[in-house]
Amino acid sequence: SNYVEKGIAKGPFSKSYPHPNENKRFAYTLVEPNTWLNAEILDKYACLKPHSGTHYLASFYSVENSQFIPADNWLISPALPGEAQTISFWANNFNSQGTKYTENFEVLYSTSGIALDDFKSTGKKFEATTGEWKEYTVNLPEGATYFAIHNNTADTYMFMLDDVTYTAGCGKVLGYNVYRDGKLLKRIEPNAEPRITDNAPSG
């Protein structure tokens, strides 16, 4: 995955329960709440439990020079096959004793590379408000080679993603290396005829 990072990431329990990547720059980080928080906290804040399994991805609020920074966190998929497909994922936001920390996010796609300017809107913009995991589905058009989930909440707190499902591509062939006895004989470009001529060693 690829991401854009801005600011120093904090966490919802930064004083008593700092998460493992506290005070580091990241857009999303892998969270395993059972190794970070005790059972009492997880029971009190059930929204912090994974949708399935033991892990999920999360982006936290960030600060720079003691100022909160609006979220601009991108999670970019591996290469896709370029065919029309429907992707799905589960998202959640942090709720605390009736306070809803709403998270805004959108899904974009690229037909070329992974520079942020390459991405176009799918027209799908969402809000996570309930503090419960919810599934989202988005249709990607023919030609889509990447998709991105962009958290762009102005007053972000904690945004969570789990169980992202999509059909992956097989990547782009960059060339072929031909070896004999561990030594490189020739590199063949991807569009060249896959053939080499070589003299066998004597004996």
Where are these regions (language model features)?
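Surface-exposed, low-complexity/disordered Ser/Thr/Gly/Pro/Asn-rich loops and linkers
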Residues: P12-L80
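Extracellular carbohydrate recognition and processing domains
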Residues: G113-G143
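Recognizes extended acidic, P/S/T-rich segments that occur
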Residues: T122-T130, K172-S202
